[in-house]
Amino acid sequence: QDKMCDVGAVSNTDTFIKQGAYNTETATSWSWGALKNINYFIDGCNDPKYCTVDDNRRDNYLGIARWFRAWFYYDKLTTYGEVPWFPHDIQSYQNDVMYKDRDSRDVIIRNLIADLDFAYEHIQATSSTGSSTLTRWAAAALKSRVCLFEAAYRRYHNLTELEITPEELYREAAKAAKLVIDNSGCSLNTATGKKGAYRDLFYNETPLTQEVILAVCANEKSGIFGEQNWWFNARSYGLCWSLVRSFVHTYLKLDGTPFTDAADYAVKSFTEEMEGRDLRLEQTVRGRNFLWDGKTAVADIKNLSLTGYQVIKYTLDESKYDGGAKNINSIPLIRYAEVLLNYAEAQAELGVITDSEWALTVGALRKRAGITGGTETLPTTVDGYLQRTFYPDVTSPVLLEIRRERAIELVAEGMRFDDLRRWKCGSLMETLPWSGIHIPGLEQPVDVNGDGVDDYYFTEGEVTAAPA
């Protein structure tokens, strides 16, 4: 959801980032029950008294279990950094083991890599109907994510005292991503489908398996539902999470040039700023032609959207899915698009990315979004707005554009907070203004989406529906 990040305004700040609010009494992330179950299974598989299947089948099951252990520990690593590594199930009498000191980041990342390498080598599935079963590509993709995070964290936090260098981890990230790129048969979804090539990835009940490597699948017949509409469309549950304008400004124009190159970009109306932009923008927020229950609708600024940029990326376009766990669309956990971005960033950080690799990764993602310019060759010009607003310490136009692309492609997928932490950009959560759509003036009706119908009437401190 990215509920804790810089690019989304929320009605209430998470206790995790409130000073003094997150402690041992309130923490919900210091749970080890899942690891106990995983290690119990691993220990049992490795004990011939209990596991009597042949070695290939056993190693397949071990690979799956070790993937889940890596998933568990990656969350611990990003949340806490150094944590105790437990390779086996702990018994209640083993207090000396249970209360051991934290292990170093080197210990954690080495074991994460070992688990994911084992999973890649031994998980037998190479494809999955509905992307709901672990495959070896899920192992390689997760490894690229894990290694990229830790490489950047070490580089940008200057952790020179650690043994494993950022360069080593960037190379591991690139190698893992390249395995997926070269061998998995995955590709970007480019069919326009129901809602557009990008939004369909999050709208469909059945995952688009050519791009979605792993997903949580809803199933109406089995009574498995999601909460996306409830979270994004109900004040009673969600946080009114809405994109902020400074981030919306980073979506490129269709010709590949920055929207902020226009002298009057800051005073453009909502309709004007949606025109001729990266197609993902109107597949992420309610745009000019958005239909709700089959009728034209704008962002619910009065009740739900704090900024006027109401997110639709995960929601279904009917009110019957609001107000509870009712969604029947599946949620991607790992996508091929992320793997491409992981590869591009790792290669760029190593200083070895080529024009062809740019075209394969960032260029391909932008082409899907309708962008025509700058997709084949590496960028050579720094976008001053992007640098000034988000990354003032980054001077490489290639890295800046990769960060732009990552933020846009993966928005609301739960990646942004980790990205901010690994790049040492957490201050953006303090400094980036929560600004919304441009309002030309108070005490006058506003037609938000340009359909000729006035939508809102803004006065000081209040928003109401426009008078008929």
PLM region descriptions:
Residues R406-R422:
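Bilobed periplasmic-binding protein-like "clamshell/Venus-flytrap" ligand-binding domains
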Residues I108, G374-D393, G441-P467:
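Surface-exposed intrinsically disordered loops and tails
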Residues Q94, G193-K221, S305-I312, E318-S319, ...:
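Carbohydrate-binding/catalytic loop surfaces
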